[in-house]
Structures are given as C-alpha cells and as structure tokens.
C-alpha cells in the first residue's frame, strides 16, 4: 500500500528529466524576483562534471567561461564573482523527511560528494508536481556537518546510510533528516518555504 503523496515506483533517469526542471525553474524564479543575474548551465557538459545547474553572477557580466577557468585552476566561484547552485527535486522527501546525500555512484564519487556548487537548492514536490518545501543548504557546511556527525551514522534517527543497486550502478547514500538539519545551526541549512 502506498503512502499519500508518494509514487509507488521510481525510475531515477526518468525522474531527473521529469522532476529536475521543477526545482530548476523555481530557483530561476527566486533569482529573477531578487533581481539577480544568472545563467542556467545544467545542459552544458563542462558544468555537469561539477554538478552545477545554475550560476548566479554578482555583477552584470555573465561569463561561465570565467567560472570554468576558476574551477580548473582549483579556485572557487568567488574567484569568478559568481555563486553556483546544484538543484535537487525530491519526490520522496515529503514523506521520508530526508534529503539524500549521494556519496558513491558506480564506484565514483556521487553527485553530492563531488559537486563544486556553493549551495544546494533542495525542493520536495508532491504527487501533483507542486513544490511543497524549499531549502537552501550551504554545501561546505553540510559536508562539515556530515563529517562531524559521522560517528552517529545508523545510531541515531536523523542520519542513516544505505547502499542501493540500480542496474549496474552501485550507489551509496546518506539519508539526512531535514527537520534535524534545519534545527542544527551548524549544518548550513535554511528552510525557504
């Protein structure tokens, strides 16, 4: 029996294509409302390897090449006068109350472990594809929080590890309770909606 608001089956590759744009569009709306200059780089291959979807520029210039140059030189987006966002749209989080931190994917670093984004914009959507909750999470602080709580994995209710197999892909994830994360001021997580 399925839980209310939860789809019974999931297809990860399809979910990224179907649900991913919902969160990306919402972040673009927020940046537009705030008058920020930004660029959607989610379809640019060079940014996919860094798991970056949207660049917000701190001036009137949009120059994704400058950002790429900074990354390849081992610098951060601040060197390119930009802020980078990774967007996650989650159809299960409204029920589980967890965000997913993918640490391992197909024997490589998972997207959350390797992202060069400054912020994670994480949204929970319901069965009707409506955004129910929005979070902005500082990626560096989240990683620090995870390392600080590493000894508590699977020994508390707010941090669990799982391994999954999707076809040939072996995936290692951490399930982090979003409510706990929001209440822990060291986590870098902020609830927007």
Question: Where do the language-model regions lie?
Answer:
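Non-catalytic C-terminal interaction segments of nucleic acid-processing enzymes
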Residues: 3, 11, 33, 57, ...
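Conserved catalytic cores of phosphodiester-cleaving nucleases, focusing on short active-site segments
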Residues: 31, 54, 70-93
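Short, conserved, surface-exposed binding loops centered on an aromatic residue
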Residues: 62, 71-77, 110-114
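Acidic-basic catalytic patches of nuclease active cores, encompassing PD-(D/E)XK
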Residues: 1-59, 91-92
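Short, solvent-exposed secondary-structure boundary motifs
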Residues: 55-62, 102-106
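Beta-rich catalytic cores
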Residues: 66
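Catalytic cores of nucleic-acid endonucleases
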Residues: 10-14, 39-40, 47, 88-134
